[in-house]
Amino acid sequence: MKQYTSELKSGADEVTSVDSNLTKLIERGVAYHHAGLTNRQRQIIEKGFREKRIKALCATPTLAAGVNLPAKRVIIRDLTRWDSSFQSNQPLPVLEIQQMLGRAGRPGFDVDGEGVLIAKNNEQKTQIVETYFEGETEPVLSRLGSEPALRTHLLSLIASGTISTTEEMHSFLKRTLFGAQGELWRTQHRINKVLDFLEKEDLIEIEGKVDGEFIPANATIQEKLKATPFGKKVSQLYIDPLSGVIIRKALESEVPPNSLGLLHTIARTPDIYSLYVRKNEMETYLTHLMQMEADLMLPPPVEHTELEFYLWDLKTALLLMDWVEETPEEHLMKRYSTTPGDIRAKVETAGWLLYSMSELSELVSPNTTKMIAELEIRISNGVRKELLPLLEIDSIGRVRARSLFNAGFTSQSSIRDAKPSELSEIPGIGDKLAEKLAGRKDPEQMRFELV
């Protein structure tokens, strides 16, 4: 078991309480698996379970699909889950339960497998058998009819030249699962609404537009669809068109570009899940809003319900700001009531959105492109600007880079010219890494230089 516990600690640039807790559990042959873990933590746990060194694994549905992790026995304790639309616990779908049970006794791994569902009484036992063992699975339904999906896919079809008229659009949609399930006529108003949005926000142009919710068949040919340069760029970046519009509005704002304003902008997009602001935190974040409003590139909404979501996005932006200011991960977990996996997921998505923003800025506000690109790299690594040159060195993350910088090694050349014994004394470096770092050859080109 030492192999896995060693990988947990040595492979981390920053060891957190989650690593310590997992280490204690793995030493006893058990572990847990959920979306709050980092990719590194999940990979180590999956490896240990696959190699049968970890005997029991407690998991959320993260293991239900997409991970080839067979088990001799799968036990499902809870058969309900909270559903916010019903404001109550609802039964898990048959398809999801069968997907979980499918992990037991996989061909090529076991001769047989066991799937166990826990019933609290005989009545529930009968219900479980009828529903999950003898019942039919739910039908697969198309999600193309939702506005976010329609926005993204219609723009993509137009930008790629797959469709160029509304007639071709309807013909294409009829051949999808969405069309085959007969949903097209039910959502015609939504399709028209999405087209209006794309046109209004300068993502597409519609020539020969016919007013009215329902378009006569003989008029559809005359409506030609064409993506604008902005629409093509948004489609190429594969972000929600609404995200592109939000980013453009921020870049066109009179507020000078700044790190908090840029991070709050990407937090406002539908492509990132924002942190929830609890009732007892509301006053705190309202205070933050009053103190920081001058730096925010998107003004707060007037409506109270919208203001609540605005504060969620502000909380997310502040988490990202703390990340690039090198706040220890353990402090971030406590301050924002989150997990290492959630932090990494936010950081990864933020990096992608900042890249998209830098690409869009070339069309909207070229003067801000360099600032955004720099912030993207800082987000990806969680560092202040001064550490950027050190991050180009292999095996150096944000914590080791800070240790090197604080010890006086502020450039790649100073590290290269150092003695291994000098480097090994720095926290987080050690003898092996010190030998590797000392005497490194100059890279062909440095991306960042301290000035």
Name what the model sees in each region:
Residues 1-51, 56, 84, 89-95:
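Conserved C-terminal RecA-like helicase domain
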